[in-house]
Structure formats: C-alpha cells, structure tokens
C-alpha cells in the first residue's frame, strides 16, 4: 500500500508536466500514465476550501478508503485527487461511485 502513494518531487513534476485533467461533481483528477503497471495516487485537500485539519483528514481517510478498492485493478496511472468544495454535501456512497466512474473514464482514455 505504501508503494501506491506519490511522494517524490520527480513524480509530481512528471505528473504536472504531462497531465490529463478529469472533472466530476466532487473531484478534480490529474492523471498521467506510468510504466509501473499499478495505480499510484496523491490527495490534495487545501486550507482554502477546507478550513480545519479535522475536515482535511476526514477527506483523506475517505478517499484512501475508496482507492483501496482500486489497488488490485492493475491500472498503470499516477493520479492526483483534488476534492471540490461540495465534498461534504453528500454521502460516502455517492462519492465512491463518482470516483469509480472517473477512474473508469481515465482507464479508457489513458491507453
């Protein structure tokens, strides 16, 4: 699971240089095909939209939980997940379906 997290500056610069952007009602995702054969991700919840650390940590926990279901799907993509302002205005199941639909769209377009 630790191998699935983007951490290096080189990985982030590669992602921002060659990104494809995908939008949904709750997320913005930057995606870039990697050569590793599995999904790697990072989560960016900023202070401007989510004021308290409790909110930001809850967002990260929920997104990590959703991504855990995707780890064994062998999707060779690096993604940066950015939640939108309305993230807390719906239940977990809607967020999960929204993110899964975005990942399917990415999988179809990235190849």
Swiss-Prot record:
<comment type="function">
    <text>RNaseP catalyzes the removal of the 5'-leader sequence from pre-tRNA to produce the mature 5'-terminus. It can also cleave other RNA substrates such as 4.5S RNA. The protein component plays an auxiliary but essential role in vivo by binding to the 5'-leader sequence and broadening the substrate specificity of the ribozyme.</text>
</comment>
<protein>
    <recommendedName>
        <fullName>Ribonuclease P protein component</fullName>
        <ecNumber>3.1.26.5</ecNumber>
    </recommendedName>
</protein>
<dbReference type="InterPro" id="IPR014721">
    <property type="entry name" value="Ribsml_uS5_D2-typ_fold_subgr"/>
</dbReference>
<dbReference type="GO" id="GO:0001682">
    <property type="term" value="P:tRNA 5'-leader removal"/>
</dbReference>
<dbReference type="GO" id="GO:0004526">
    <property type="term" value="F:ribonuclease P activity"/>
</dbReference>
<dbReference type="InterPro" id="IPR020568">
    <property type="entry name" value="Ribosomal_Su5_D2-typ_SF"/>
</dbReference>
<keyword id="KW-0694">RNA-binding</keyword>
<dbReference type="GO" id="GO:0030677">
    <property type="term" value="C:ribonuclease P complex"/>
</dbReference>
<dbReference type="Pfam" id="PF00825">
    <property type="entry name" value="Ribonuclease_P"/>
</dbReference>
<keyword id="KW-0819">tRNA processing</keyword>
<dbReference type="GO" id="GO:0000049">
    <property type="term" value="F:tRNA binding"/>
</dbReference>
<dbReference type="InterPro" id="IPR000100">
    <property type="entry name" value="RNase_P"/>
</dbReference>
<dbReference type="InterPro" id="IPR020539">
    <property type="entry name" value="RNase_P_CS"/>
</dbReference>
<comment type="similarity">
    <text>Belongs to the RnpA family.</text>
</comment>
<dbReference type="GO" id="GO:0042781">
    <property type="term" value="F:3'-tRNA processing endoribonuclease activity"/>
</dbReference>
<keyword id="KW-0540">Nuclease</keyword>
<keyword id="KW-0378">Hydrolase</keyword>
<comment type="subunit">
    <text>Consists of a catalytic RNA component (M1 or rnpB) and a protein subunit.</text>
</comment>
<keyword id="KW-0255">Endonuclease</keyword>
């Amino acid at each position: 699971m630790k191998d699935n997290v983007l951490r290096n500056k080189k990985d982030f610069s590669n992602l921002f240089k060659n990104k494809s952007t995908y939008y949904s009602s709750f997320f913005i995702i930057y995606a870039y095909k990697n050569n590793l054969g599995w999904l790697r991700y990072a989560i960016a919840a900023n202070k401007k939209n989510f004021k308290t650390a409790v909110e930001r940590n809850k967002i990260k926990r929920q997104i990590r939980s959703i991504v855990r279901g995707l780890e064994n799907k062998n999707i060779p993509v690096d993604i940066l997940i950015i939640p939108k302002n309305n993230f807390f205005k719906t239940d977990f199941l809607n967020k999960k379906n929204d993110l899964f639909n975005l990942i399917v769209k990415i999988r179809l377009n990235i190849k």
